């Protein structure tokens, strides 16, 4: 029998799993700065392996999309798994294993120039089966780099 988690503990565990336990996300160096049921903010620093255009030294579009996807996933999954006051860790992990991205629509608004990037997401809607989030990516100068709408299977 697994531990019973409060909604707050469940949200903390989801954040740790998404950002610090997934090898790809760790490789990107993501840091979770703020995480609530319907809002998430994560940041990462530009690294040589993230450059998609070496002549301009800008982020690869896949890195941008990945950061947006993770930020959106946090609010879609977190809001779903914390609807009740408590959840067992086993149930959380089992339900999480069935959740995933259905669609991610990215608008690349500016070249990904900068040293540090911040992705912020907010929940638009959470149903029993599907959740939708809106995400933005800014650099350290607060230039708007990209936005996305993400749809997740959550039930």
Swiss-Prot record:
<dbReference type="GO" id="GO:0016289">
    <property type="term" value="F:acyl-CoA hydrolase activity"/>
</dbReference>
<dbReference type="Pfam" id="PF03061">
    <property type="entry name" value="4HBT"/>
</dbReference>
<dbReference type="GO" id="GO:0005829">
    <property type="term" value="C:cytosol"/>
</dbReference>
<comment type="function">
    <text>Displays thioesterase activity against medium- to long-chain acyl-CoA substrates. Is involved in the thioesterase-dependent beta-oxidation pathway of (9Z,11E)-octadecadienoate (conjugated linoleic acid or CLA), along with TesB and FadM. In vitro, is active against decanoyl-CoA and palmitoyl-CoA (hexadecanoyl-CoA), but not with acetyl-, butyl- or benzoyl-CoA. Lacks general lipase or amidase activity. Likely plays an important and specific role under natural conditions in permitting the metabolism of unusual carbon sources.</text>
</comment>
<dbReference type="InterPro" id="IPR006683">
    <property type="entry name" value="Thioestr_dom"/>
</dbReference>
<comment type="similarity">
    <text>Belongs to the YigI thioesterase family.</text>
</comment>
<protein>
    <recommendedName>
        <fullName>Medium/long-chain acyl-CoA thioesterase YigI</fullName>
        <ecNumber>3.1.2.20</ecNumber>
    </recommendedName>
</protein>
<keyword id="KW-0963">Cytoplasm</keyword>
<dbReference type="GO" id="GO:0006629">
    <property type="term" value="P:lipid metabolic process"/>
</dbReference>
<dbReference type="GO" id="GO:0032787">
    <property type="term" value="P:monocarboxylic acid metabolic process"/>
</dbReference>
<keyword id="KW-0378">Hydrolase</keyword>
<dbReference type="InterPro" id="IPR003736">
    <property type="entry name" value="PAAI_dom"/>
</dbReference>
<keyword id="KW-0443">Lipid metabolism</keyword>
<dbReference type="InterPro" id="IPR029069">
    <property type="entry name" value="HotDog_dom_sf"/>
</dbReference>
């Amino acid at each position: 029998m697994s531990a019973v988690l409060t909604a707050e503990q469940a949200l903390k565990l989801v954040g740790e799993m998404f950002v610090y336990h997934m090898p790809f996300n760790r490789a990107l160096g993501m840091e979770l700065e703020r995480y609530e049921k319907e809002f998430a903010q994560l940041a990462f620093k530009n690294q040589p392996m993230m450059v998609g255009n070496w002549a301009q030294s800008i982020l690869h579009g896949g890195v941008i999309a990945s950061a947006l996807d993770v930020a959106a996933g946090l609010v879609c999954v977190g809001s779903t798994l914390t609807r009740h006051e408590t959840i067992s860790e086993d149930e959380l992990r089992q339900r999480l294993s069935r959740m995933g991205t259905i669609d991610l629509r990215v608008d690349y608004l500016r070249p990904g120039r900068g040293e540090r990037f911040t992705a912020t997401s907010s929940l638009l809607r959470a149903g029993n089966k599907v959740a939708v989030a809106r995400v933005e990516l800014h650099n350290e100068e607060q230039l708007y780099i990209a936005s996305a709408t993400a749809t997740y299977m959550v039930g």
